[in-house]
Each structure stands twice: as C-alpha cells, then as structure tokens.
C-alpha cells in the first residue's frame, strides 16, 4: 500500500510542475528513425512502451541507452500475425506491404493485449511468443475532451507523470511540403502519430 501512495504522490508532484521532460529522469530512449515507412504509429507506441518500462523500473538490467524494442516487428505482427500458441489466429495473414500500411497506436495496444509481446533485435519475423522481451499488462486510453481542454491536458500530464510517455495522433491541416489542406479533407484519419514525453 505504501508503494501505491508513494507513486500517487510522485505522479501528482510531477503533473503539477510548470514543465517536465522525461529525458531529465533518464526514461526516454533515443529517437528511432522510421525512414520512409508509414509506421509512425508503431514507433510512437514502442517509444511510449520503452519509457513505461524505464519509469516503472521493472527491469533493472536496462537503461535508456540499452533498451531497444523493435517497432517494425510490432507493425509486422499487426498485419501478419500467423498462429498463436492456441491456434486461435490460424490464417491471420494479410498480403500487404506492412511498411506502407497506416495504423494507430491502438493497433499495438490491441496486439499486445493478445499476448503478442514486443521483441528486441532487428529481425521483424521474430516469434513474439517464444522470444518476448516483455509482456503487456495494460494501456490507458484518454478520450479527447473538447468541452474541457484544461482537464484533457491535465489527464495527459498525469499519464506522462505516471507511465513516462503517451502517444497521440493528429491531422496536420496546415500547408507545408508534406501536409497540405488540399489533400487533407477533414478526414477522420489522423495521418501522424507521436510520443509526448513532457511539457
């Protein structure tokens, strides 16, 4: 019970700060380059997972410089799950170029909730059941709160303070080289995902 109260106090203390940066606490891993893939959603999810692992202290053998989960392997398994150990997902294979598929962080949360674990290393086809780096236990969803943006921001700060990072998606409708309002017609899609590590 003491650990819970201590964590609650720390979460409140951090979320009440005028500014916070998880890098100052050593819980943010180096930025990974998604290259020319559409996998920002996988990269942002893995970055948040890495920060959560470091924040929680569940693995004393890793640091921000040594912890490196594979976002491409996570994206690969979203589209090419194959069979789970119980045979419940036999035939779950999509013949798509997973590197170019859009997605959202919720896809990773759903995948990991089915015990498809994150993996380390560079091999995207690594079996996540036989070679898990960690196991997913929970995810927190913060619904958008347009009627009370201050409370929405407070919820995000509390989640960062408690877990280390959050992911989000946005639809950038301003006109730039890569984002252009002529091409973004107020769709329900959010074409980019990022990780927030502070404020």
Residues covered by each model-derived region:
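Catalytic-core signature of thiol
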Residues: 1-199
């Amino acid at each position: 019970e003491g650990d819970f109260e201590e964590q609650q106090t720390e979460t409140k203390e951090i979320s009440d700060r005028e500014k916070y940066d998880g890098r100052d606490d050593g819980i943010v891993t180096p930025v990974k380059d998604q290259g020319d893939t559409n996998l920002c959603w996988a990269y942002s999810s893995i970055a948040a997972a890495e920060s959560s692992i470091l924040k929680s202290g569940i693995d004393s053998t890793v640091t921000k410089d040594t912890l490196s989960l594979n976002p491409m392997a996570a994206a690969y398994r979203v589209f090419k799950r194959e069979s789970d150990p119980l045979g419940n997902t036999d035939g779950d294979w999509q013949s798509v170029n997973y590197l170019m598929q859009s997605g959202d962080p919720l896809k990773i949360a759903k995948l990991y909730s089915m015990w498809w674990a994150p993996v380390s290393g560079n091999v995207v086809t690594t079996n996540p059941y036989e070679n898990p780096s960690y196991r997913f236990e929970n995810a927190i969803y913060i619904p958008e709160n347009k009627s009370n943006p201050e409370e929405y921001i407070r919820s995000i700060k509390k989640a960062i303070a408690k877990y280390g990072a959050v992911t989000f998606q946005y639809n950038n409708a301003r006109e730039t080289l890569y984002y252009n309002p002529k091409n973004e017609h107020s769709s329900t899609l959010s074409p980019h995902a990022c990780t927030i590590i502070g404020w």
